[in-house]
Amino acid sequence: MDIKTALSRIVGHLDLSTEEMRSVMREIMTGQCTDAQIGAFMMAMRMKSESIDEIVGAVSAMRELADRVELKTLDGVVDVVGTGGDGANIFNVSTASSFVVAAAGCTVAKHGNRAVSGKSGSADLLEAAGIYLNLTPVQVARCIDNVGIGFMFAQSHHGAMKYAAGPRRDLGLRTLFNMLGPLTNPAGVKHQVVGVFTQALCRPLAEVLQRLGSKHVLVVHSQDGLDEFSLAAPTYVAELKNDQITEYWVQPEDLGMKSQSLFGLVVESPAASLELIRDALGRRKTEHGQKAAEMIVLNAGAALYAADHASSLKEGVALAHDALHTGLAREKLEELGAFTAVFKQENEG
């Protein structure tokens, strides 16, 4: 199906099949559509509302065209990722959590990009930390094998997305493409914590990942609007495990933590986010650093559970707490920087 036919269908509020959507996305991502067609398609899809079949088709096309990272095994390899767009501007919780997960002995294949709407995306933060981002897929795999964590910069692995970049920027609205990043990890991980910008997406994205073969995934949105677990409010979870989806609310107290406000966790830049994270992963000299550490532990615990490294969310949080207090997470951050510096020299001379 071509994009013109698809548009006439969508404008009539008719859904596309998975295969039809895959075909249209291939057209878009191989440069066969005009900016006007892509913009109209994104807007029409948003107004109609995307079906599960359509999201599965879009994700399938994007995965096919990605520069994949081949790992020795995907057993227990996890990604902690969010759609962004929650407007909260708090520090990079999922990225910081990833280093605690690695410190706990669990392998992390982190996928991320620059900020969507916030002040600091995962790529912005890691760049500020001196981590080289423009790695080849083989180099990312070597990071994961040697350090226990590697970062896949979305722009490097999803080059075909460049064709939609202009229309996305010009529209300035959330579209289907905002959902695709967390669902298109180039290593093909089967274990994830996926934060989303609205609770309404939790169940649908869990169903999409179920259709695409994921093993254990938590799709989450907190009552106070975050695309991650919150210390300040209950968090809604759609959990895919054993090919079944269950939905529930989680309070910090359920996991052995204390509810508290997010005051002091908002950042204005990647450098400010990095400073807070280094304090949280280090000696926690400030009150805000201590609070950030607890937010990190909460989300790292969820990732350890999703990776089947822990048998429950509560056990995952306890393991994450222990891992953070060893100081090893801070060491992992520095180690990844040193490891990627070698690749920078190889790639840039």
UniProtKB/Swiss-Prot annotation:
Cofactors: Mg(2+)
A Pfam entry, by short name: Glycos_transf_3
Gene: trpD
Binding site for anthranilate 1: 82, 113
Protein name: Anthranilate phosphoribosyltransferase
Residues at which anthranilate 2 binds: 168
Family of the protein in this entry: Belongs to the anthranilate phosphoribosyltransferase family.
GO MF term set: anthranilate phosphoribosyltransferase activity; magnesium ion binding
Binding annotation for Mg(2+) 2: 227-228
Superkingdom as given in the UniProt entry: Bacteria
Binding positions (Mg(2+) 1): 94, 228
Top EC class of this enzyme: transferase
EC nos: 2.4.2.18
Organism, scientific name: Pseudomonas fluorescens (strain ATCC BAA-477 / NRRL B-23932 / Pf-5)
An annotated GO cellular component: cytosol
Keyword Transmembrane helix set for record: no
One record GO biological process: L-tryptophan biosynthetic process
Cofactor comment: Binds 2 magnesium ions per monomer.
Keyword Metal-binding: yes
UniProt: 5-phospho-alpha-D-ribose 1-diphosphate binding residues: 82, 85-86, 92-95, 110-118, 122
Pathway: Amino-acid biosynthesis; L-tryptophan biosynthesis; L-tryptophan from chorismate: step 2/5
